Amino acid sequence: PFIPLGTKLDPHGRFVAKWGLVEGIAHNFVSVYIPPQLHASTLGDLGKSILDLPPGVTVIGGDFNALMDRGKDSSSGVGTQVLATDTRFKEWVGSLGLCDAWRIWNPNLIQYTHTSAAHGSHSRLDYLLMPSTDIHLTCGARVLPRGLSDHSPVQISIGKEGAQRRPMWRLNAWFLQDPQFAKHMGEDIRQY
């Protein structure tokens, strides 16, 4: 069972983070909804909250309304215009050192999590992201059958060996977009 130790709610309702213990091992779970007009500030706030989580196995999941790979993740396929939101999302995932856990286990599978009746299209908009330092703990991933929603749930299985290992620290590149932070960091580097 999951023993909760803490919760953080986004004031705008975009994400909720819960942390606690599973079989005595620290875990962080973040549930995300990013609206279709993906704003850099929303990703920045989410990134800061992720970096503030206590050490533990971390899973960030939800509807990001963006595509990692338009060729594999959209029925529209290759050749359609790559949207700025897709590019921003991929850059954000990379800047935090996150991996698409489902894609790691299904590198060539074409499977969708969202159906748009209005557009007559299918997309994979729902992701389970994990730090690259935790991805070795996964034992599998799959898309589950759709229920009443227009989105299908995604499931990963996590083992427990090595789960207490602390992840490597990494500077979130989103901080460098803040002029005051970049100036302060530059002064510290020159002083060092």
Stretch-by-stretch model annotation:
Residues P1-A26, V32:
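Structured beta-strand-rich core segments of catalytic domains in phosphoester-bond hydrolases
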Residues P1-D10, G97-I104, L137-P145:
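Short secondary-structure junctions
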Residues L5-K8, W19, K48-I50, T115-H119, ...:
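Beta-strand elements of modular eukaryotic interaction domains
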Residues K8, S41-D45, K72-S75, R142-V143, ...:
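Short coil/turn segments at secondary-structure boundaries
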Residues K8-G13, L38, N106-P107, H119-S123, ...:
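A short catalytic or substrate-binding loop motif that flags glycine-/basic-rich loops and adjacent residues
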Residues W19-L21, V57-V59, S121-S123, Y127-L128, ...:
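Surface polyanion/phosphate-binding segment centered on an Asp-His-Pro turn
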Residues V32-I34, F64:
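Active-site metal-binding loops of divalent metal-dependent hydrolases
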Residues T42-T133, G186-Y192:
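Metal-dependent phosphoesterases centered on the DNase I-like endonuclease/exonuclease/phosphatase
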